[in-house]
């Protein structure tokens, strides 16, 4: 009985050990893929990446093949040598990233025999061009990546190799791109296919440069320079410059004199008398060293007053000194006294007469003494012209000021707004300094809001004034700008005519 009890104990013990061993040992399937195959498939599924897709511009369905294609190709080409040097780090990134995405839903890779592995590897389709997906625009999508299968050194079956089938991922700050394989031959194939699909030619930049060089354009097509980029100088008002200019353009339409007051209002005064008065006021401004804005405002007040008030020629000089007194009080730090203006007229008018005319002018103007003049716009336009100009800065500024002051003498130029006169003065000054170069460019057209064709008539009128020469009977302005402090710009030779192609707008 004791022997039977021992036998039963041994039988039960062996059966329990066998049952425990059977419970611990994984079951092997008929195809050779058991628990080990599922574990390998699970590891492979954890490393699966986005499926490769065709990114050729034809398949993408839009966009020029030049710019976008170039950007994509450069990223793919530059990523290749980086990947070869940091394959392990890239694989770790892919494993950690893919583990957070669904991996259980992927099917295990089918097991193949050792002698079939070489044949199946050769029959695998060549890899497609790596997809470059902007991470900010598209969310990553994971799909099974079962195109590459490599043999494993175990028994009669093989599974996905750890070093051959891992879909390595690399990341850059802006783009997420997907690549397969780690051999130099695969990388070379990817680059060749990318070049073929994207149709990128090495001569594209050369052809584009040649097209730009041979493009016919009467005006220089260039980029617009940023003039208002100095935010440290409070006098430039960089943040408000554009708004100030638009306000001045609107204000000049409201505070302009009539263009025909000599024909409709004045009976005893003609344009020649007006020119003589202004020429004399230029001498007065030089005598008292008044700023140019005072002279421009004086002429503005005179023309606005003459636009609505008839006056005889004996009081025209009185009107001139009264308007200059008002302008000096507005512009100058230390304006001349009334007695000085009486003295400058050789005491032709008494103090009370000057003050009476001053009150009459202010009442007619309704005390609206702030008016945009050509000098206001010229100061802005000179700065714009000097940003990308090779001409000497002072020569351009003085020559433009000289042309603008000549415009004060001409009654017919009242038909042009002050901003147009200032832009035309810049145009003519640049032409005089460089007769063979187009005076206008994109930067001037942008900031002045005038095309070269719009300046044609005014520029030609200023050109005639400039070409009169020193023989004119109104010499004050010319003598002023023949001084050394103004770089003798009044003596600059001027071509007899301006080419018509300079007044053609740019064609892009």
Curated annotation (Swiss-Prot):
Protein's UniProt keywords contain Iron-sulfur: no
SMART domains according to UniProt: CYCLIN, Cyclin_C
Tissue expression pattern: Expressed in the dividing region of the root cap and root apex. Expressed in the intercalary meristem of internodes and in adventitious roots under submergence conditions.
Ranges of biased composition (kind: Low complexity): 1-28, 98-111
Highest taxon of source: Eukaryota
Coiled-coil residue windows: none
A family per Pfam: Cyclin_C
UniProt GO BP: cell division; G1/S transition of mitotic cell cycle
Gly residues bias: start-end ranges: 29-39
UniProt keyword Secreted, yes or no: no
Ranges where the record places region Disordered: 1-40, 82-125
GO cellular component terms, semicolon-separated: cyclin-dependent protein kinase holoenzyme complex; cytoplasm; nucleus
CDD domains on file: CYCLIN_AtCycA-like_rpt2, CYCLIN_AtCycA_like_rpt1
Keywords: Cell cycle, Cell division, Cyclin, Mitosis
Induction: By gibberellin (GA3) and submergence.
GO MF term list: cyclin-dependent protein serine/threonine kinase regulator activity
Family of the protein in this entry: Belongs to the cyclin family. Cyclin AB subfamily.
Cited function: Involved in the control of the cell cycle at the G2/M (mitosis) transition.
Protein name: Cyclin-A1-1
Name of the encoding gene: CYCA1-1
């Amino acid at each position: 009985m004791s022997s039977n009890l021992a036998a039963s104990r041994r039988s039960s013990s062996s059966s329990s050990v066998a049952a425990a061993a059977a419970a611990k040992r994984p079951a092997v399937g008929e195809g050779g893929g058991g628990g080990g195959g599922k574990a390998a498939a699970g590891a492979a599924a954890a490393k699966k990446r986005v499926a490769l897709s065709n990114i050729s511009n034809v398949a993408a369905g839009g966009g020029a093949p030049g710019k976008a294609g170039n950007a994509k190709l450069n990223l793919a080409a530059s990523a290749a040598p980086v990947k070869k040097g940091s394959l392990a780090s890239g694989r770790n990134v892919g494993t950690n990233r893919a583990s957070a995405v669904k991996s259980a839903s992927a099917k295990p890779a089918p097991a193949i025999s050792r002698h079939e592995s070489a044949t199946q590897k050769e029959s695998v389709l060549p890899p497609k061009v790596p997809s470059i997906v902007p991470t900010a625009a598209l969310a990553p999508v994971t799909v099974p990546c079962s195109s590459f299968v490599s043999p494993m050194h175990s028994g009669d079956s093989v599974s996905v190799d750890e070093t051959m089938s891992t879909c390595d991922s690399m990341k850059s700050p802006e783009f997420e791109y997907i690549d397969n394989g780690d051999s130099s031959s695969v990388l070379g194939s990817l680059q060749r296919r990318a070049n073929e699909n994207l149709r990128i030619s090495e001569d594209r930049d050369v052809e584009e440069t040649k097209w730009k060089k041979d493009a016919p354009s009467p005006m220089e097509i260039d980029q617009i320079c940023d003039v208002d980029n100095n935010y440290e100088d409070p006098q430039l008002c960089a943040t408000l410059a554009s708004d100030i200019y638009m306000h001045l353009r609107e204000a000049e339409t409201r505070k302009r004199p009539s263009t025909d007051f000599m024909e409709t209002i004045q009976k005893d005064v003609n344009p020649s008398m007006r020119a003589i008065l202004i020429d004399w006021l230029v001498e007065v401004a030089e005598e008292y060293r008044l700023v140019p804005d005072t002279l421009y405002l004086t002429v503005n007040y005179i023309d606005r007053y003459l636009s609505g008030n008839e006056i005889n020629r004996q009081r025209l000089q009185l009107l001139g000194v009264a308007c200059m007194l008002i302008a000096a009080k507005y512009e100058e730090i230390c304006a001349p006294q009334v007695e000085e203006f009486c003295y400058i007229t050789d005491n032709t008018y008494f103090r009370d007469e000057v003050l009476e005319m001053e009150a009459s002018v202010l009442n007619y103007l309704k005390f609206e003494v702030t008016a945009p003049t050509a000098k206001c716009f010229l100061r802005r336009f000179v700065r714009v012209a000097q940003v990308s100009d090779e001409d000497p800065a002072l020569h351009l500024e003085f020559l433009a000021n000289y042309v603008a002051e000549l415009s004060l003498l001409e009654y017919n130029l009242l038909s042009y707004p002050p901003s147009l006169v200032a832009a035309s003065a810049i145009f003519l000054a640049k032409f005089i300094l460089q007769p063979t170069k187009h005076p206008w460019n994109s930067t001037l057209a942008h900031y002045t809001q005038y095309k070269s064709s719009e300046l044609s008539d005014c520029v030609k009128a200023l050109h005639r004034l400039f070409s009169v020469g020193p023989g004119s009977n109104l010499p004050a302005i010319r003598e002023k700008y023949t001084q050394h402090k103004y770089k003798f710009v009044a003596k600059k030779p001027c071509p007899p005519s301006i080419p018509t192609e300079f007044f053609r707008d740019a064609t892009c």
